């Protein structure tokens, strides 16, 4: 006869791939929704058009960061390229510049940062947490899936860091991170 600990360990190992698949499915669903939402989008916020769109297109056309003396407004050069580098990565993958790709890339960053609350042991609770976070972001920052601004991204990334720190069970890892 097998002892209970051995059987429990086997059962736990059997559940791990299923939890990963469920989490991945949620991620995939959010990515598909994001893709559909961003189809045929145009810039909706002044910052998106004035900075993020211009810097993204510059990166795609010139294949390098702007330098002093380039045709861009000098005020743009004073600001870090930030997420436009990730937008550029997606332009490069798709082989073209598109506003739709900009928003889609931004949403992948957002969804990835939100995914810190996913608990592979409790998918229903994870979906509730994701929903609450999206609602809170929308209440505080407006429609976060239709903006290229980084304010809400910085907030959710900071939240993600605190969430990881707070939920870490190994005290030594807490001290290292």
What kind of region is each of these model predictions?
Residues 32-34, 40, 47-49, 136-138, ...:
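Short hydrophobic/aromatic segments of transmembrane alpha-helices and their interfaces
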Residues 30, 104-121, 125-165, 175-177:
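Membrane-embedded helix bundles of polyisoprenyl
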Residues 20-25, 80, 98, 124, ...:
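Alpha-helix initiation/capping motif
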Residues 1-35:
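Start-transfer (signal-anchor) and selected internal transmembrane alpha helices
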Residues 28-33, 59-65, 133-138:
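Short amphipathic alpha-helical segments, especially helix-boundary/capping motifs
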Residues 34-125:
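Active-site lumenal/periplasmic loops and adjacent helix-entry segments of GT-C-fold
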Residues 9, 53-54, 157:
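A ubiquitous, low-specificity "background" feature that marks scattered single residues
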Residues 2-16, 120-124, 164-176:
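Membrane-interface junctions at the ends of membrane-embedded or membrane-associated helices
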């Amino acid at each position: 006869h097998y002892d209970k600990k051995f059987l429990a360990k086997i059962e736990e190992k059997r559940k791990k791939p299923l939890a990963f698949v469920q989490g991945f499915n949620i991620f995939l669903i959010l990515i598909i929704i994001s893709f559909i939402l961003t189809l045929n989008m145009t810039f909706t916020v002044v910052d998106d058009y004035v900075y993020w769109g211009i810097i993204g297109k510059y990166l795609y056309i010139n294949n390098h960061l702007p330098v002093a003396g380039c045709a861009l407004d000098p005020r743009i050069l004073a600001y870090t390229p930030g997420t436009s580098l990730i937008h550029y990565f997606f332009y490069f993958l798709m082989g073209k510049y598109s506003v739709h790709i900009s928003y889609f890339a931004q949403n992948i960053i957002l969804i990835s940062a939100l995914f810190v609350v996913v608990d592979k042991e409790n998918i229903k609770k994870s979906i509730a947490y994701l929903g609450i976070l999206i609602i809170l972001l929308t209440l505080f920052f407006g429609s976060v899936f239709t903006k290229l601004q980084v304010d809400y991204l910085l907030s959710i990334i900071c939240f993600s860091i605190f969430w990881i720190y707070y939920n870490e069970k190994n005290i030594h890892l807490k001290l290292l991170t």
